[in-house]
């Protein structure tokens, strides 16, 4: 089951048919045993898989829970009304055509629950009730299957009209203020037990393709206006059927022909009529509806696409952190006790861990930064001027795998004017990135791989005021510092799963941080020097926008979502170290920690020769 996450949405509001119905109708079979519960269109649960065992959850319910939202309850349930329980926000109802779905959004008394010729309960459609759509909610729409199964769609013109009707529901929600919508297309209706029994698989496939193409064209008008997260259910279905073993499904039967609980398609040893029924091995519960295994796969799929922009945004953080680490490494060469009046060449390196960023759907990031470089310093007036080039690499291991490798170039200067010390650093980095986004789909896992390039620059200014006398071996000074970092990642395309692969846009990211602190530095006396620095820092920008993405198989619409932000805007940094001199050679080693609730370590080592 998917892990719950803190939600970026106020609620989830669903419109659709039986695939998303979370219990509008009563469970008539269970009433005979005195059990009052709701019907859902999937298999019942173990141990008996028969009434009065409850039905499993549909994908929309699973998705709401994964997003950290309240339970997704039916909007028009007679059971909840009789028990005096509040209505929910799931308007999806078994048997709904696209016209019924539109009615549940826009019409007075448009949310209707009942059977053939019988209405059990009705209430106003969503927008009739609320007037304006909640802009913070996540809207989920699916539909169209019943238009095919009920004989409404028999030709291309009818398939076109059906798709237009579903899109009109999107039109109404967007006009009323909805900003984020999940919209699913149709799988191949012919590749179901019902399609097999109809003898019209080829026709149903062709008309399903017409429906999906028209829906794509209608939704494309909202590209850039609102976020529409497309679900390519057709591609997902094809992927599952092509590799059923990956998903824990049976590999010895035609999954498109078999089902779990209906005699007309209960043709396997896993069906309800078998001695050891096991719905987890089958894709269909009846002639059209998924088992709980299918529902879980679809929920996982939707969840992965919703959270993908935040996950992919972490690559920008790795690039930013690489330049930040470069500046801290260069800053260690500018410590007053590290300098003399001679030319100096040096090699240096660093290692640091970062767990600084989190957001909704993204927990703490575990990243490592490493660098090794060579540089030179020359005396200029009352200070020093230098340059360095360093090879840098970084890794981010959770919740996505990102590897960074490249070069960072820095120019730096320090000057003294009386008791006032000033220093500046400017850096440029050019990096290659390898990214791997892991997706869980029920029991299956998919890895989406990609590669791209990144670049960025950073600038830092620092001022300090020396408290100790000029002739003292100690340089003790309070300081203030400001650092700015700007990065760019080129867009790329993921590979590894047609249903999941994304087109990722260029990413821009910046970071501003300021520090105040106290530094203490003793130049080498008898060949030994020490230093220490304590700083309080503040990140001046709270978040960066999440990455814009499109589904590669349905590129008509883009979405991003909530940006990446830190748990804490402030931090403490402590650095200490030791330096040794032997003739013209000098070795400096430093270590420190940075953070607030948790402290991440960093280490630096430098060796130089003066002449």
Tell what function each PLM region has.
Residues 314-476, 566, 588-610:
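Outer membrane beta-barrel translocator domains of Type V secretion systems
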Residues 14, 92, 140-144, 348, ...:
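Short beta-strand segments
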Residues 2-338, 351-358:
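Conserved active-site regions of diverse hydrolases
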Residues 152-155, 159, 193-204, 243-264, ...:
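Solvent-exposed, glycine/polar-rich loop segments of beta-barrel outer-membrane systems
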């Amino acid at each position: 089951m998917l892990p719950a996450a803190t939600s970026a949405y106020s609620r989830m509001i669903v419109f659709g048919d039986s695939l998303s119905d979370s219990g509008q109708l009563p469970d008539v079979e269970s009433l005979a045993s005195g059990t009052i519960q709701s019907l859902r269109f999937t298999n019942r649960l173990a141990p008996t898989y028969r009434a009065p065992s409850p039905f499993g959850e549909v994908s929309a319910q699973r998705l709401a829970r994964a997003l950290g939202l309240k339970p997704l309850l039916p909007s028009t349930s007679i059971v909840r009304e009789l028990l005096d329980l509040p209505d929910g926000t799931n308007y999806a109802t078994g048997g709904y055509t696209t016209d019924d779905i539109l009615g549940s959004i826009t019409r007075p008394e448009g949310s209707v629950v009942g059977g053939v010729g019988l209405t059990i309960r009705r209430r106003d459609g969503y927008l009739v009730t609320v007037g304006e759509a909640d802009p913070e909610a996540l809207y989920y729409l699916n539909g169209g299957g019943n238009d095919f199964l009920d004989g409404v769609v028999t030709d291309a013109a009818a398939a076109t009209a059906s798709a237009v009707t579903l899109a009109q529901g999107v039109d109404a929600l967007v006009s009323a203020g909805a900003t984020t919508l999940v919209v699913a297309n149709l799988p191949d209706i012919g590749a179901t037990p019902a399609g097999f029994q109809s003898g019209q698989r080829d026709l149903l496939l062709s008309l399903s393709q017409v429906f999906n193409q028209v829906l794509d064209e209608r939704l494309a008008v909202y590209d850039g206006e609102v976020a529409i997260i497309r679900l390519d259910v057709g591609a997902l279905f094809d992927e599952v059927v092509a590799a059923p073993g990956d998903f824990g499904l049976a590999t010895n039967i035609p999954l498109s022909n078999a089902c779990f609980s209906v005699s007309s398609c209960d043709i396997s040893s896993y069906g309800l009529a078998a001695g050891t029924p096991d719905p987890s091995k089958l894709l269909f519960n009846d002639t059209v509806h998924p088992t709980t295994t299918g529902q879980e796969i679809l929920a996982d799929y939707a969840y992965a696409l919703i959270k993908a922009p935040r996950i992919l945004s972490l690559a920008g953080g790795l690039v930013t952190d690489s330049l930040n680490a470069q500046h801290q490494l260069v800053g260690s060469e500018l410590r007053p006790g590290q300098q003399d009046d001679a030319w100096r060449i040096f090699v240096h390196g660093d290692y640091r861990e970062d767990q600084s960023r989190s957001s909704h759907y993204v927990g703490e990031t575990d990243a490592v930064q490493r660098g090794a470089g060579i540089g030179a310093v020359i005396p200029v007036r009352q200070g020093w001027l230098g340059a360095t080039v360093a090879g840098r690499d970084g890794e981010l291991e959770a919740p996505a795998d990102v590897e960074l490798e490249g070069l960072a170039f820095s120019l730096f200067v320090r000057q003294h004017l009386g008791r006032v010390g000033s220093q500046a650093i400017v850096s440029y980095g050019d990096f290659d990135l390898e990214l791997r986004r892991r997706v869980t789909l029920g029991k299956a896992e998919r890895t989406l791989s990609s590669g791209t390039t990144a670049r960025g620059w950073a600038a830092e200014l620092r001022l300090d005021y020396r408290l100790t006398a000029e002739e003292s071996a100690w340089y003790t000074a309070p300081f203030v510092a400001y650092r700015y970092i700007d990065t760019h990642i080129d867009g790329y395309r993921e590979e590894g799963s047609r249903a999941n692969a994304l087109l990722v846009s260029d990413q821009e990211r910046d970071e501003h941080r300021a520090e105040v602190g106290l530094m203490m530095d003793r130049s080498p006396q008898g060949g030994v020097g020490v230093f220490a620095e304590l700083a309080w820092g503040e990140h001046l920008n709270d978040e960066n926008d999440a990455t814009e993405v499109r589904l590669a198989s349905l590129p008509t619409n883009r979405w991003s979502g909530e940006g990446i932000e830190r748990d804490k805007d402030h931090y403490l940094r402590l650095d200490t170290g030791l330096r040794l001199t032997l003739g013209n050679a000098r070795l400096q080693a430093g270590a420190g920690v940075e953070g607030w609730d948790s402290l991440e370590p960093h280490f630096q080592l430098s060796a130089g020769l003066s002449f």
